[in-house]
Amino acid sequence: MAPHIPRSILVIDDEPSFVRALTRLLQRDGYVVETAGNGRDGLAALQRQRYDVILCDLRMPELDGRAFYAHLQQRAPSLCQRVIFLTGDSSAADNQAFFAQCGRPWLDKPCSTAAIRRAIAQVLERARRAPQLPCKC
């Protein structure tokens, strides 16, 4: 029997207390977690390692979630299916338009544990059926 390889998750968010709480939850669930405080650092992390899931805040300094996703679409489209967005304002018209356009799942902050686990499970199931190509970020 092959050894169990833990799934890896990249959390991109600029709110330290939220990142700490989310990291603790994910690690308790058996995931290996790396964090980045903005989209630019998230892209750098993707150059170093592959991730099974990317949890990305929409509003951040330097490179926000929309710009991060646009970069993935151009340079690493196979990774787009692994993104789950986080936002404190999903009802804003610009956020609704973005979510409709990109077709990716999103979670409202603060997120329930059940919602986080459900979104991750759905992304992992879909990603299992598609190859992950290297990031040219």
Where are these regions (language model features)?
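Non-catalytic signal-transmission and effector/linker regions of two-component phosphorelay proteins
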Residues: 1-8, 112-137
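Acidic catalytic/metal-coordinating carboxylates
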Residues: 37-41, 64-70
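Active-site residues of response regulator receiver
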Residues: 13, 57
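Charged docking surfaces used in two-component/phosphorelay signaling
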Residues: 20-28
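Active-site beta3 strand of CheY-like receiver
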Residues: 49-55
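Receiver (REC) domain active-site loop signature in two-component systems and cognate sites
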Residues: 60
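Alpha4 helix (beta4-alpha4-beta5 surface) of REC/receiver domains from two-component response regulators
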Residues: 67, 89-108, 114, 118
